[in-house]
C-alpha cells in the first residue's frame, strides 16, 4: 500500500495547479497520503496556489511514487531526482509532447486505482554521463533521454572516435553524435534519423548528426 505520493505539477503547464488540485482531491477520496511539491518556481506567482506546498528534497524520504504533471520535459527533470532514490515516476501529460506520460488529463480518475495497487512499475534504462579531461571527471550526471556531443559554436565539422569497452565502434565526421537510451530513441535521435527502440531494450542508439561520412 502506498504510504506517500508526491504530486509534482509544472506551474507553467498546470496554471493555478488546477489539475494537481483535482488529482489531490481524487487521492484524498481514496485515503492515499499525498503532498504537493512544485519542482519549478513560477516567478510570476511566488505567493503560492492555495495549497500547502512542501520542499521536494525534504519530501523524497519515504515517498513511494512521484506523479509529474506537465510534458516530457517535466518528467525528464524529475527522473534524475527520482532515480537517486529509486522512486517510480508516473507522468500525466499536460504538454504538447507526451511520449513518456502514462495518463492524459482526462484520465485523472484512474489515480484512484493506485491504493488498490492496480498498476505496474516499468524499469527504464538511464545513461550515466561523465566528461573526463586529463584523467579528471569535470562533469557527471544521469540522463533518461540522451547525451549529445556537438561542435557547438565552431563553424566546421568535428571528428569523433567512438569506442566501447570492446573496442572501436565507429568514427563520425559531422556536426556531432547522439547517444540515446531506449526512452530517448523517440526524441532527438529519432529526429536525426535514428531508429526507435522498445522501452525495455537493453541497449543504446548511437546516431550521427549531419554526418559527412561514416568510416
Task: Please report, for each region that a protein language model flagged, where it lies by residue.
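Short glycine-rich anion-binding loops that position phosphate/pyrophosphate groups of nucleotides
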Residues: 11-12, 72-74, 97, 183-185
